[in-house]
Amino acid sequence: MVKKQNCVAMLLAGGKGSRLSALTKNLAKPAVPFGGKYRIIDFTLSNCSNSGIETVGILTQYQPLELHNYIGIGNAWDLDRVNGGVTVLPPYAEASGVKWYTGTASAIYQNMNFLRQYNPEYVLILSGDHIYKMDYSKMLDYHIAKEADVSISVIEVPWDEASRFGIMNTNEEMEIVEFEEKPQFPKSNLASMGIYIFNWAILKEYLEMDARNPDSSNDFGKDVLPLLLDEGKKLIAYPFQGYWKDVGTVKSLWEANMDLLRDESLLQLNDHEWRVYSVNPNEPPQFISETAKVEESLINEGCIIEGEVRHSVLFQGVTVDEGSKVIDSVVMPGAHIGKNVVIEKAIVGPGMVIEDGEVIRSEKNTDDVVLIAEGI
């Protein structure tokens, strides 16, 4: 396991998530509900805890209030430590004014003092908006064994989707020889997962160089990594095999929730050897009435089910009244589904009230996912 004095994690959690539409109107993307009882950020924080990483800086910016309240002091993930633990790092004001994070590299650069107080040998940089399980200590062992300056976790994606990602072109030793940001004609299908391990000395040097460059967009993928390659630093690709999902769109968020219902899913929430931790909602047990019918679904605590629920994910405190059908759908916390409602292939946002007799399904394209949320 990683020793906290050797490796400090910096978790980027300030993204707006605009492609999630109304779900992120008043909520940071990492705080979006997922999987019946979790938030997206739970997966990265649980990975840190399970990997033995005990010092985590969480960099927030967009609509941070609910995310800050949710994280608290990190006790849900066993990260409430006297030394280290979780520290929330929002942008702050200097004499010259508030300095907003302008890119991923800018966010880390503006929190160099946080890293300096620990003076780690390695810095693990993470994104708080992906769904996956990963042992970061194995990646660190790989980084050390390869004597790398930077290691980047990569995953094979379908060739017809490779142009959507930052693509790493490597040699036979998995050394990265070229980085292409969303190439039209990709040479490789190794996509960056946005997970980096830097030697601390290298990170300091190149973040300072990037900050001095007036033409930089202050982004790791666009600016810092290409600069490292140009200067001959050793960048290594770390191949990851397992479930990984970028839930940046309404459809991909729905797909990831549906993946949990598959018998052969690579993402198992009931794996006691690698638990996914979350904040307990403290709701009473769910109630399934005699009029209810539930098949192949995740029903969280506090739910009252009087209608039919099939192949769906229901969060805490959801009510489905008699005569209603919820099929292939995700219903987020506190939503109330009235009587004789039909909901099919949809996401119902937190606290939404669906009136009696409503029919919610896509009429134009059966491949669409309908989003019902405040602000739509």
Swiss-Prot record:
Record's catalysed reaction(s): alpha-D-glucose 1-phosphate + ATP + H(+) = ADP-alpha-D-glucose + diphosphate
KW Zinc (keyword) present: no
Binding-site residues for alpha-D-glucose 1-phosphate, renumbered to this chain: 101, 166, 181-182, 192
Metabolic or biological pathway, per its Swiss-Prot or TrEMBL entry: Glycan biosynthesis; glycogen biosynthesis
GO MF annotations, alphabetized: ATP binding; glucose-1-phosphate adenylyltransferase activity
Keyword vocabulary terms for this entry: ATP-binding, Carbohydrate metabolism, Glycogen biosynthesis, Glycogen metabolism, Nucleotide-binding, Nucleotidyltransferase, Transferase
Keyword Transferase attributed: yes
GO biological process assignments: glycogen biosynthetic process
Known EC number: 2.7.7.27
Taxonomic superkingdom: Bacteria
PROSITE patterns, per database record: ADP_GLC_PYROPHOSPH_1 (PS00808), ADP_GLC_PYROPHOSPH_2 (PS00809)
Subunit structure: Homotetramer.
HAMAP family with a match to the protein in the record: GlgC
Described function: Involved in the biosynthesis of ADP-glucose, a building block required for the elongation reactions to produce glycogen. Catalyzes the reaction between ATP and alpha-D-glucose 1-phosphate (G1P) to produce pyrophosphate and ADP-Glc.
Similarity comment: Belongs to the bacterial/plant glucose-1-phosphate adenylyltransferase family.
Protein's name in the database: Glucose-1-phosphate adenylyltransferase
Organism (species): Bacillus cytotoxicus (strain DSM 22905 / CIP 110041 / 391-98 / NVH 391-98)
